[in-house]
């Protein structure tokens, strides 16, 4: 072999071979193959020749030793090559069937003391129905009270002696946390003192102030409230807020003073002091009602029957009437109704004359309430707690209570509960109170419709709803969305106000943005199944008539928060029910994103679901692309994030540090008239901005004044209450950024200077620009608040073509911004009202913790008849994160606090002062805070660090500023 023709690796490097040499090689190869194969394989041989690699280099990985799977099995067979160990050991080869379950539900209908058919029959008689919301402060015994009603009507459901039943805490998270998160409806049949049965639709609501949106949803579909107050703690933060909310919703108010056993067993008050304590609570509630209500007849008193007393833990519940009936049943020949009228107030019983007097017969005489109610109650509790073995059996015999030997051997708490249950019997006093003082759906319908329906009450539809007509056109108002056990679907919960809803019926669902002019927010759906909800089980029904509550399947897809369900045809004039108006504001903000970016669609679906589940939750996307959740507090957002991660998206989600929403405002009048020209130079608008009068923004938000009023009524309000001149008061164009927004646009032009007809033709466009501007302020894209914008001059083009919305709207927005920036702009931050309960020796520690967080105490007073103090304070929401934990650490867990949004307050410092240097990782002094908040908010939103005036000031306006020698702190 000639070595010159090959390199050291054996590759051929010689001259190209001629065709004769190639033919010789092919000939040799064909002879060898002919010896091995039959003549029939000649064609295959040709293919082999073509595929032969020849002399080129073949990489190891390209060498083919075996035929491919496709060649072996054919092109029709799919083959998958699986590398070894790609599946982690933590993941099973065959995954088990995954069942999600987040709530505790009964598998079958439990036994009740009434037939289900009887319950269904009562639904047809609206006069025998009561729709009631149970509300009250945190841990004042609402859920425990419902447990007593459930035990009374469900003989097989009994709570264990060592723990509460909590039948309406159906979510596992509620039971783990020991606090109600969702409002839970319960429909049961209860008898009154005379044995007459009524259908009670009760909704048990959370007591924590963070979840007051759940209470709002319950109040909307109720005709009255039962306000629960702890006898030992008295009126607390949320009690006062709920009284105000119920009065605003125009609902009947009754009170249940719960946990009266605490006065006896815990505080150990003498009977007379216990009476003073109870009377103080009633007086305090009446004082609050008179403060918020204009109805002078709305007075609470045990004598009127709208106050009852209870101890849910020991199955005690009575009104003066029901306690008097116990005496009547025991001694006979007593008119218990007349007797009940003498059991409250400064009334004494004279045993010699056997008469009641207003003057004490002797110095040692007790008031009738103490003598006939509290002293017997004290004796029963004292006998059970103190003398179980000696005198208790004899005492029980005198009361007609018979216990077995096994029952007498019970521990003190269960024994006391059993004795009280046998003595007081069923909760008929509570039923009497609700029946007498809370209107039936038929009686309360007119008030409910006037308050909640946006359409006319005088229309045929309005009249049908006012009469609660089951044969009228269908109108159903849904206020809550409840997810299924597995968190996949939602059922809409609401109240039928007119007509009858049937399973399988086609309906039209009207959303919150639906109007007769814009019907986009509506959808035709088919009702699935219908249920009556009883906390842990649902009773399926075929139809639900007017006046009842209903859980609806199949209509959840178009509903976001609340909705109006009506008939698809023949109800064209139907309008929506007013969206819920919450008594708190969502000011805490967190940004979320999935750990794995590819799971973003799952997170978005989860966000849509939590938005449905929580009434006041708001979700939005910032311009920077981050997804933001707004809630009322830390606990609220913690529950939202649990549901988002575990129930609805099942993915890992990253959460940013919590921040708060800000507002933008002004503290002076604009330093000069600000104007802006439209892009076509044919129109020019001039405005100034100035602060609103104190209290006016709150009046607008609380709908004390409404933009829908006629000009005369509107003018009178502003003239009398805020000293506006009549011309300005009657020239109000709009509130912004919506009908209840805390900003005002006023037309302050004169007919002699401005063509009012032309100005009127572009009014809608200017209002739209004003509302757009106030929705996103120039400082950091936050809401503008407390600002009055005055239109001083307007040059409007004659031709309609030159004054279209595309020209006017952005110009109006720009002039709003420029007028705002010329009026000494400031940032506003939300402030929380904090109520702390602590022993006297911990009060100083509370002051210390608050002072470190820019907080200040407004009131510090002892709770009457209790060893605790109540400290009331204000704290900036941005400094409130971790406050509760900090407080408990400093007081060894003895202090308990609740906080709720109260007001907006100006942040100290000028946000536009460029001389301030923000040092990273250092707390800023007070005058630097506004600047720090603005810069960090703008960074987070993806905006430039400083406000650029070139966006908001036209060239002619900048020239005018230069002439006026106005120094601006803004970059060009």
Curated annotation (Swiss-Prot):
All copies of domain tr-type G, residue ranges: 127-409
Region of interest called Disordered, as start-end residue ranges on this chain: 1-53
One of the GO BP terms on file: mRNA splicing, via spliceosome
Origin: domain of life: Eukaryota
Positions bound to GTP: 136-143, 204-208, 258-261
Sorted UniProt keywords: GTP-binding, mRNA processing, mRNA splicing, Nucleotide-binding, Nucleus, Spliceosome
GO MF annotation list: GTP binding; GTPase activity; U5 snRNA binding
This protein's GO CC annotations: cytosol; nucleus; U2-type catalytic step 2 spliceosome; U2-type precatalytic spliceosome; U4/U6 x U5 tri-snRNP complex
Subcellular location: Nucleus
PROSITE patterns in UniProt: G_TR_2
Pfam families on file: EFG_C, EFG_III, EFG_IV, EFTUD2, GTP_EFTU, GTP_EFTU_D2
Annotated InterPro entries: EFG_II, EFG_III/V, EFG_V-like, EFTu-like_2, EFTUD2_N, P-loop_NTPase, Ribosomal_Su5_D2-typ_SF, Ribsml_uS5_D2-typ_fold_subgr
Subunit-level organization: Component of the U5 snRNP and the U4/U6-U5 tri-snRNP complex, a building block of the spliceosome. Component of the pre-catalytic, catalytic and post-catalytic spliceosome complexes. Component of the minor spliceosome, which splices U12-type introns.
Database matches in NCBIfam families: small_GTP
Family: Belongs to the TRAFAC class translation factor GTPase superfamily. Classic translation factor GTPase family. EF-G/EF-2 subfamily.
Described purpose of this protein according to its UniProt entry: Required for pre-mRNA splicing as component of the spliceosome, including pre-catalytic, catalytic and post-catalytic spliceosomal complexes. Component of the U5 snRNP and the U4/U6-U5 tri-snRNP complex, a building block of the spliceosome. As a component of the minor spliceosome, involved in the splicing of U12-type introns in pre-mRNAs.
Name listed for the protein in its UniProt record: 116 kDa U5 small nuclear ribonucleoprotein component
């Amino acid at each position: 072999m000639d070595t010159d023709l090959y390199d050291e690796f054996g590759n051929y490097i010689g001259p190209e071979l001629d065709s004769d040499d190639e033919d010789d090689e092919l000939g040799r190869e064909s002879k060898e193959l002919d010896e091995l194969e039959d003549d029939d394989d000649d064609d295959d041989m040709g293919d082999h020749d073509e595929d032969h690699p020849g002399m080129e280099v073949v990489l190891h990985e390209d060498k083919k030793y075996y035929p491919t799977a496709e060649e072996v099995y054919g092109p029709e067979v799919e083959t998958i090559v699986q590398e070894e160990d790609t599946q982690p050991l933590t993941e099973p080869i065959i995954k088990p069937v995954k069942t999600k379950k987040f709530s505790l539900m009964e598998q079958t209908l439990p036994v009740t003391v009434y037939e289900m058919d009887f319950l269904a029959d009562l639904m047809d008689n609206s006069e025998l129905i009561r729709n009631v919301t149970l509300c009250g402060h945190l841990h004042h015994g609402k859920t425990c009270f419902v447990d007593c009603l459930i035990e009374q009507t469900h003989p097989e459901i009994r709570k264990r002696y060592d723990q509460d039943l909590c039948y309406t805490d159906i979510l596992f998270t509620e039971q783990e946390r020991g606090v109600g998160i969702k409002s839970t409806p319960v429909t049961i049949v209860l008898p009154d003192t005379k044995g007459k049965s009524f259908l009670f639709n009760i909704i048990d609501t959370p007591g924590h102030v963070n979840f007051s949106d759940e209470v709002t949803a319950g109040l909307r579909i109720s005709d009255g409230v039962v306000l629960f107050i702890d006898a030992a703690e008295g009126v607390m933060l949320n009690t006062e807020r709920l009284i105000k909310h119920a009065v605003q919703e125009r609902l009947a108010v009754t009170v249940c003073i719960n946990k009266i056993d605490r006065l006896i067993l815990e505080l150990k008050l003498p009977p007379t002091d216990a009476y003073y304590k109870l009377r103080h609570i009633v007086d305090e509630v009446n004082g609050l009602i008179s403060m918020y209500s204009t109805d002078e007849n709305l007075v609470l008193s045990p004598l009127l029957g709208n106050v009852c007393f209870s101890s849910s833990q020991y199955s005690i519940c009575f009104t003066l009437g029901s306690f008097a009936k116990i005496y009547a049943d025991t001694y006979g020949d007593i008119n218990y109704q007349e007797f009940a009228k003498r059991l409250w107030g400064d009334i004494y019983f004279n045993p010699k004359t056997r008469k009641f007097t207003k003057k004490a017969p002797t110095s040692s005489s007790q008031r009738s309430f103490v003598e006939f109610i509290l002293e017997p109650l004290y004796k029963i509790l004292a006998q059970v707690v103190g003398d179980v073995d000696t005198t208790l059996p004899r005492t029980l015999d005198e009361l007609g209570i018979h216990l077995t030997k096994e029952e007498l051997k019970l521990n003190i708490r269960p024994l006391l509960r059993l004795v009280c249950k046998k003595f007081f019997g069923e909760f008929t006093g509570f039923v009497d109170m609700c029946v007498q003082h809370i209107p039936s759906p038929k009686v309360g319908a007119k008030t409910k419709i006037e308050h909640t329906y946006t359409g006319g009450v005088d229309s045929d539809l309005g009249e049908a709803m006012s009469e609660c007509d089951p044969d009228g056109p269908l109108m159903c108002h849904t206020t809550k969305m409840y997810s299924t056990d597995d968190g996949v679907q939602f059922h809409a919960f609401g109240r039928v106000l007119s007509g009858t809803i049937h399973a399988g019926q086609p309906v039209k669902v009207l959303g919150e943005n639906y109007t007769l002019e814009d019907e986009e927010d509506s959808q035709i759906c088919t009702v699935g199944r219908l249920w009556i909800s009883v906390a842990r089980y649902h009773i399926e029904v075929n139809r639900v008539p007017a006046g009842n509550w209903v859980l609806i399947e199949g209509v959840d897809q178009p509903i976001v928060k609340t909705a109006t369900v009506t008939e698809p045809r023949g109800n064209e004039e139907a309008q929506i029910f007013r969206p819920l108006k919450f008594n708190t504001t969502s000011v805490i903000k967190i940004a979320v994103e999935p750990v794995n970016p590819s799971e973003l669609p799952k997170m978005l679906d989860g966000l849509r679901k939590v938005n449905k589940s929580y009434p006041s939750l708001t979700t939005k996307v910032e311009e920077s692309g981050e997804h933001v959740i707004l809630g009322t507090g830390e606990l609220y957002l913690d529950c939202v994030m649990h549901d988002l991660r575990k129930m609805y998206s099942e993915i890992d989600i990253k959460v940013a540090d919590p921040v708060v929403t800000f507002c933008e405002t002004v503290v002076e009048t604009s330093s000069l008239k600000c104007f802006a020209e439209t892009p076509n130079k044919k129109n020019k608008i001039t405005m100034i901005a100035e602060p609103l009068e104190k209290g006016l923004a709150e009046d607008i938000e609380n709908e004390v004044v409404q933009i829908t009023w006629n000009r005369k009524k509107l003018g009178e309000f502003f003239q009398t209450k805020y000293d506006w001149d009549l011309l300005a008061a009657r020239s109000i164009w709009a509130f912004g950024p919506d009908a209840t927004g805390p900003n005002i646009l006023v037309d302050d032009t004169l007919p002699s200077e401005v063509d009012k007809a032309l100005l009127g033709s572009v009014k809608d466009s200017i209002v739209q620009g004003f509302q757009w501007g106030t929705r996103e302020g120039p400082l950091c894209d936050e809401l503008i608040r407390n600002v009055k914008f005055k239109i001083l001059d307007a040059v409007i083009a004659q031709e309609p073509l030159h004054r279209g919305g595309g020209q006017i709207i952005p110009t109006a927005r720009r002039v709003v911004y420029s007028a705002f920036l010329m009026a000494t702009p400031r940032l506003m931050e939300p402030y929380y009202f904090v109520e702390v309960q602590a022993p006297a020796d911990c009060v100083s520690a509370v002051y210390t913790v608050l002072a470190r967080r820019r907080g200040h105490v407004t009131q510090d007073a002892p709770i009457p008849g209790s060893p605790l103090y109540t400290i009331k304070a204000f704290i900036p929401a941005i400094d409130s994160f971790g406050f509760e934990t900090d407080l408990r650490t400093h007081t060894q867990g003895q202090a308990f606090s609740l906080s709720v949004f109260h007001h907006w307050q100006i942040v100290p410092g000028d946000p536009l002062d460029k001389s301030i240097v923000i040092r990273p990782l250092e707390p800023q002094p007070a005058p630097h805070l506004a600047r720090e908040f603005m810069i960090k908010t703008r960074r987070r939103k993806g905006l430039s660090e400083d406000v650029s005036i070139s966006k908001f000031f036209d060239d002619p306006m900048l020239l005018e500023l230069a002439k006026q020698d106005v120094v601006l702190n803004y970059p060009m």
